[in-house]
Amino acid sequence: MNKKKKINRTKVDTVRSVNNNIRSSVRKLNPILKAIVGKKVDVAIRELQFSAKRITREIRKTVSSAVANAENNNQYDIDKLIVKEAYCGKKVVMKRFRPRAKGRAAPILKPYSTITIILSEAKQMESHGSKS
């Protein structure tokens, strides 16, 4: 009867921000989140700002919150921050019903999701001499 230990995904050199209960499905969030992983924070925010998707506003707010956490809590340099991880998970699904013909009802599913953004500082590659 051992309790499962909670695994902390963040390391010491990372900063995270979580946005719970976003009114969108995981299927719609995943392509947007995969597009910003590995990019600098300012580039990721700019791409989200000019995207035509409705949900990018919520993702942009989460990335901005992670940047604020990095600046205030850990004193990281904003210009060196990159998006290390960005993933989403399922939350609750609200179930509603729409009346249809002949007394029937059709289900309407309204899924909710959670977004986690993890930032880290980009490591500078130092070159020691030339490669020959």
Curated annotation (Swiss-Prot):
Instruction: Write the protein's name.
Output: Large ribosomal subunit protein uL22
PANTHER family on file: CHLOROPLAST 50S RIBOSOMAL PROTEIN L22-RELATED, LARGE RIBOSOMAL SUBUNIT PROTEIN UL22M
Organism phylogeny: Bacteria, Pseudomonadati, Pseudomonadota, Alphaproteobacteria, Candidatus Pelagibacterales
Cleavable signal peptide: none
Any one of the GO CC terms:
cytosolic large ribosomal subunit
Q: Which UniProt keywords apply?
A: Ribonucleoprotein, Ribosomal protein, RNA-binding, rRNA-binding
Which family does the record claim for this protein?
Answer: Belongs to the universal ribosomal protein uL22 family.
Which NCBIfam families does the record associate with it? rplV_bact
| Purpose | This protein binds specifically to 23S rRNA; its binding is stimulated by other ribosomal proteins, e.g. L4, L17, and L20. It is important during the early stages of 50S assembly. It makes multiple contacts with different domains of the 23S rRNA in the assembled 50S subunit and ribosome. The globular domain of the protein is located near the polypeptide exit tunnel on the outside of the subunit, while an extended beta-hairpin is found that lines the wall of the exit tunnel in the center of the 70S ribosome.
Instruction: From the UniProt record, list the coiled-coil ranges.
Output: none
Q: Name one GO biological process term.
A: translation
Q: Which InterPro entries match?
A: Ribosomal_uL22, Ribosomal_uL22_bac/chlpt-type, Ribosomal_uL22_bac/org-type, Ribosomal_uL22_sf
Q: Which CDD domains match?
A: Ribosomal_L22
- What molecular functions are annotated in GO for this chain? rRNA binding; structural constituent of ribosome
Pfam families, per database record: Ribosomal_L22
Subunit annotation: Part of the 50S ribosomal subunit.
